[in-house]
């Protein structure tokens, strides 16, 4: 399989389905290389999230991994075993102690199917960032999860309910940017449809 250099990805999660169908609901949207000097490819970004062949990973290089880890830690009350998980940097000794949790995070994300949309535009602010931002705004249930206006809310057993990040808990997505009451651009769905058609 030939991977596109750049694109937008959509993760799903076992047990998380849309409200009125049995179809899986999107739980995370993301892209990469939003800075002009970035050389990160779509495949490299997905590998950062999913971890390596031996299931190790680096949650300090992936906010997605960090969110999953905090949720597992909070759910199982493991804060004393992983007190440095949310810190931006850590010694080699600390990272070695976190190996077990990194593997658990890799195992969880490894079970999550995903789709990607090829958008081979230039690095920096781009159509990819436009699609990412509007997709998140469209699917976010920030502040609506337990109301009648919620659209495809998370299940009661969703791991994200235990995440330390409030935006994750209140939106029903493993995202923290663009989830709070942002408006969807009126031409977004037309743009998304055209991009999907162009990608083949």
Annotate each predicted stretch with a short phrase.
Residues 1-104, 108-200:
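GIY-YIG nuclease catalytic motif and its immediate N-terminal context
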